[in-house]
């Protein structure tokens, strides 16, 4: 049986090592389970063919770096379209004939974030929808077709989806839950870093849209971090850093610097999956604020980045989305609701790093391990 990993967001963003790392955890987990897996990556063409070729080259280079050469088929779609016709795509890494032969036999598609669309979608035998962002997916499923009529199973990392306190838009689909994947064979625990650096990696500005109480609020990191920007003054013995896409001439940089935050370019420190892992390992812990709607709606969402930090033996300080109840009591997390709790959490990590680091790694192995979660999703 062939397991296809359907993805449409790794190749097109070649500066995003963290972005690429998401499907990478899935693929490495499938390999650990000794399954016949193929990474199926969709790359829509742009007007810049030279840039497209650079994206293709980078995608191939990253797969080779992780021992996955020959285990992928990149579907280059020219022109780009919201519908996916295999006849209109060029297959790279695997011939179209070989792909069709695989599709003719028993197969499963793990469709990450609805990356693969109809009519190509109908060629897979068993189609599993894997939701990585419940607040957006559940909201937009109430507005448009997002694969809800064309998949056999639906899985979400919204761990709290079935509880009464979860305020995600109602869905008639039978959702099952899984944890964000971290390949704990790739992500090994690292020694204590020299610096007490609390950091995170992400996008300071956000272009998405989710309606909350009739409005479309700004859910960017810029807004979500605002209540916590006084932390460097409260805990001067710690260093606070943000690997965020803030341009050098953006006034936000100067404002954050005045408040004690060091801003670094994520394209410099986390451009590849390897450098992304190295940057996380350089941290004492992760500190981050998350999309407010996940907190307000109590979705139970946790980030794949947090899972990776844990696997590396790095504690995580973040806001609670209702996910805490689905974790072991000792888990390496410190969940917070305001700056006072954040200050206490940072001081806890500074005082008890060794113990929290052990708890973080143990939780990653027990809960977030890629092979463990894939075994559950695929019912192995």
Q: How would you describe each model-predicted region?
A:
Residues 5-165, 270-275, 279, 295-297:
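Extended catalytic core of nucleotide-activated donor transferases of GT-like folds
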Residues 13-19, 24-25, 31-45, 219-222, ...:
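Catalytic binding pocket for nucleotide-activated donors in carbohydrate/polymer assembly enzymes
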Residues 28-36, 61-72, 149-153, 175, ...:
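Structural alpha-beta junctions
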Residues 121-128, 135, 170-188, 312-314:
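P-loop/Walker A phosphate-binding loop and immediately adjacent motor/lid segment at beta-alpha junctions
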Residues 165-282, 293:
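Conserved catalytic-core segment of nucleotide-activated headgroup transferases in glycan assembly
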